């Protein structure tokens, strides 16, 4: 299984990149996590609809056909760490590749969210995009650790 995080926005602060890289390197070879950052569409005189459509095209261009798409969305289904571990295990058992998509500052195109296989919410809080990358990779690592009974996660 290949797990890809697709994030709109290419530049994150050094602290966020360092934290992301630290968690990403902890995954085993059979569950490598890849980050694909796509360019944010400039706002200059574009309607929100056109801006989101342009970002959608970029997102879709880096997702391989047949990949299970999970959109992060503030109105998505809330998920606990244990529930995320169950999802991760199911994804691994299915053998499907999975792409988890983080939208840009204006979110994700509504049609893209509708076409996603799942929509998940990480938090009820509004989080900066750099923080979402770190939070997501940490929670994926924690979920993986639960699936193998690794002591990283404690209840």
Curated annotation (Swiss-Prot):
It is an enzyme of class 2 (transferase). Keywords: Cytoplasm, Methyltransferase, rRNA processing, S-adenosyl-L-methionine, Transferase. GO terms for cellular component: cytoplasm. Its EC number is 2.1.1.177. InterPro entries: Alpha/beta_knot_MTases (IPR029028), RlmH-like (IPR003742), tRNA_m1G_MTases_N (IPR029026). Gene3D superfamilies: 3.40.1280.10. It comes from the Bacteria. It is found in: Cytoplasm. Belongs to the RNA methyltransferase RlmH family. PANTHER family: METHYLTRANSFERASE (PTHR33603), RIBOSOMAL RNA LARGE SUBUNIT METHYLTRANSFERASE H (PTHR33603:SF1). Specifically methylates the pseudouridine at position 1915 (m3Psi1915) in 23S rRNA. This is Ribosomal RNA large subunit methyltransferase H. It comes from Polaromonas sp. (strain JS666 / ATCC BAA-500). The lineage of its organism: Bacteria, Pseudomonadati, Pseudomonadota, Betaproteobacteria, Burkholderiales. The gene is rlmH.
């Amino acid at each position: 299984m290949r797990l890809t995080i697709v994030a709109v926005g290419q530049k994150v602060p050094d602290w966020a990149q360092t934290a992301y890289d630290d968690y990403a390197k902890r995954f085993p070879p059979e569950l490598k996590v890849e980050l694909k950052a796509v360019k944010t569409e400039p706002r200059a005189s574009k309607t929100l609809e056109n801006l989101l459509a342009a970002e959608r095209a970029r997102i879709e261009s880096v997702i391989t056909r047949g990949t299970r798409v999970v959109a992060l969305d503030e109105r998505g289904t809330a998920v606990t760490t244990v529930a995320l571990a169950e999802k991760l295990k199911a994804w691994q058992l299915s053998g499907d590749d999975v792409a988890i998509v983080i939208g840009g500052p204006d979110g994700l195109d509504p049609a893209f969210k509708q076409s996603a296989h799942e929509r998940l919410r990480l938090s009820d809080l509004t989080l900066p995009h750099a923080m979402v990358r770190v939070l997501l990779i940490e929670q994926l690592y924690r979920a993986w650790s639960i699936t193998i009974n690794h002591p990283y996660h404690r209840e």
